[in-house]
């Protein structure tokens, strides 16, 4: 009979211990709402059958995988990293191997150093052989590559690798066109048809005022092209005139010395004496050549001065001339001219 009593006592103690268990259940019930969101997220993930968003990024550079230079490469240890990070690890391993082979007694290689045809996992140090000693030969993680949401990546990644997301802000632009439609309300008032003409006159007035002050980029380029063409033509004219002057000068001197007067070459007839009957008559070619040479020399000097003036004149002078022609830009032109003088000094 003692055993049943003990059993009954045990059965009586179990109800007595129920308040504690009830308190534990209450604490668990209080903690349950805190982790309700996490449970809902886990449930959503398990229902969807897709890995969490953290699995779509490389654990080395924390960039999302893509189909180009950050392709998800699967190692033999089933760890996944992007192709670019694995390539950097391979290059560093090759550099460390070259540095270790230089001394006579090479030090102990680091744990991540592998043969040229293998790469060590940054997490577990497991060595994975590289096909053809290239990271490109590693297989891709097809589960991540096929299930990766591109739209989600474009929304979360501040610097997407493939392309920028489309700009939907331009779509409402056509909707901005309806505001001009309220213009029809003015027609119902036929009495004031004259007020509308003055606004166009006021709008047209600022146009001519702004024309002298502003210059379109096309006009500036055409002006620069014309100036460059004028300088080139002037330089060609100066060179041609100088060469022609030299040739004509030598030709004129030769004709004057040899055919300037009768007698032997190089000496004319003495003054006051008539030329001999057999002597050649003086040729006018020499004086003509000398005259043309002098004219060409003067022309070369003038053109050279004009070219130097056009090329080296200060911009303030041009601004002052344009401002004076515009009429309303006097103070601005003076300020520009003063700034140009200060910059020249």
UniProtKB/Swiss-Prot annotation:
It is a multi-pass membrane protein. The keyword Nucleotide-binding does not apply. SUPFAM superfamilies: RING/U-box. GO terms for molecular function: ubiquitin protein ligase activity; zinc ion binding. The keyword Metal-binding applies. PROSITE patterns: ZF_RING_1, ZF_RING_2. Residues 1-21, 202-213, 332-345 have a biased composition (Low complexity). GO terms for biological process: protein ubiquitination. The chain crosses the membrane at residues 236-256, 290-310. A zinc finger (RING-type) spans 58-125. Its main location: membrane. This is RING finger protein 228. It comes from Homo sapiens.
